[in-house]
């Protein structure tokens, strides 16, 4: 929370999953140590529990708790890596972001840890002055479900959010094939469950919970 002069509340909310939060990492490096090397060596140790592809937030400097806060705050920034790659870096933080983006994707971890070219969609970074003897570094991942909302309250009434247009999502067409078993969850029986075999393709309908 930052208190500034004015008569409005500017609010950013992130509904963050526990899987990615559990993979948060912190280290106190020596001043001569490489931030890039530490992050690249650390990401594989996170496994797939943070649900890649997602974002990495990197916080550098300050105190240990400040570095963690910087990493979390950086995840609130919009995804703009493609724009950054097109125009090129203009400062050391943008250079760091690009290098980490390329090297982490080069690890080949991929979606859900199953291998692939894309492990991170973007890398965010913020820094802060720190003691010359220290280099606190934090990295916090954000999963592929990046649920953010930003709104302003000015006293005129509650915030109103328009639901997204379903036309923004592409239509998915695929062939079901003859071997698909249609399962109605509303009338599912134990005998039907016992008839399933490993490798069966199930097409579910009805209420699951």
Range-by-range predicted roles:
Residues 1, 6-58, 63-174:
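Non-transmembrane, aqueous-exposed alpha-helical and coiled segments at domain scale
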Residues 15, 185, 206:
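Pocket-edge structural micro-motifs
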Residues 201, 207-209:
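Short, charged beta-turn/beta-strand-edge "cap" motif at the junction between a beta-strand
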């Amino acid at each position: 929370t930052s208190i500034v002069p004015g008569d409005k509340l500017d609010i950013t909310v992130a509904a963050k999953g526990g899987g990615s939060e559990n993979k948060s990492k912190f280290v106190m490096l020596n001043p001569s140590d490489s931030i890039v090397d530490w992050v690249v060596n650390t990401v594989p140790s996170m496994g797939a529990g943070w649900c890649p592809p997602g974002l990495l937030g990197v916080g550098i400097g300050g105190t240990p708790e400040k570095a963690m806060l910087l990493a979390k705050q950086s995840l609130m920034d919009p995804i703009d890596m493609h724009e950054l790659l097109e125009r090129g870096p203009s400062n050391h933080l943008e250079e760091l972001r690009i290098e980490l983006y390329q090297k982490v994707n080069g690890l080949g971890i991929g979606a859900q840890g199953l291998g692939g070219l894309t492990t991170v969609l973007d890398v965010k970074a913020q820094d802060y002055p720190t003691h010359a003897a220290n280099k606190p570094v934090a990295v916090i991942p954000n999963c592929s479900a990046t649920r953010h909302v930003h709104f302003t309250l000015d006293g005129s009434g509650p915030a109103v959010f328009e639901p997204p247009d379903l036309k923004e999502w592409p239509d998915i067409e695929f062939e079901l094939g003859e071997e698909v078993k249609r399962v109605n969850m509303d009338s599912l029986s134990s005998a039907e469950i016992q008839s399933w075999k490993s490798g069966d393709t199930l097409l579910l309908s009805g209420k699951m919970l």
